[in-house]
């Protein structure tokens, strides 16, 4: 978090201190998460215009993190908090699963590892995450798409499924075109573009 303080899309750090048997960190007081807000809205859904604006600002948060050389690997509405009174109304939090994707010495993309452990939250994780593949920027964008799908279209088809194999199967059979084209055809083009990305893109 200290490395991304120059960007307003992340919480501002306050005081870091140490007591005799504890360490503490204070940070900017932020508003509720998008997940919390959705639960408070009748029908559990944003208006179309609010969903579009939120999608844009989430993407700006992701872009900022990627510019700093990190991928998040756990994007979900619960990790996006609101902030009042600024031109940056959303803030990205929870970097416990984040990882550098750029070699700080060479400036080049880190190589694709053969197999890794699962990272993320199953509802919003990419198929690559389910298949224990190394994640990159494209996987953050897939998680972003799942988020905005819920904002604009409807709950994800696997939202209430708990079995990880069944979740993966539903994702593999996810007919995005038939779901989004009648409402927001541009979303399908975004989905196609994201899925055309390679590991280092």
Regions flagged by a language model, labelled:
Residues 1-8:
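Structural motif at the C-terminus of the N-lobe alphaC helix and the adjacent alphaC-beta4 loop
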Residues 12-23:
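Short beta-strand micro-motifs within the conserved protein kinase catalytic domain, predominantly
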Residues 30-40:
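Structural motif in protein kinase domains
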Residues 54-55:
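Activation segment signature within eukaryotic-like protein kinase domains
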Residues 66-84:
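Catalytic-loop of the protein kinase fold
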Residues 83-119:
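Activation segment/activation loop of eukaryotic-type protein kinase catalytic domains
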Residues 106-107, 118-133:
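Protein kinase subdomain VIII
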Residues 127-184:
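Conserved C-lobe activation region of Hanks-type protein kinase-like domains
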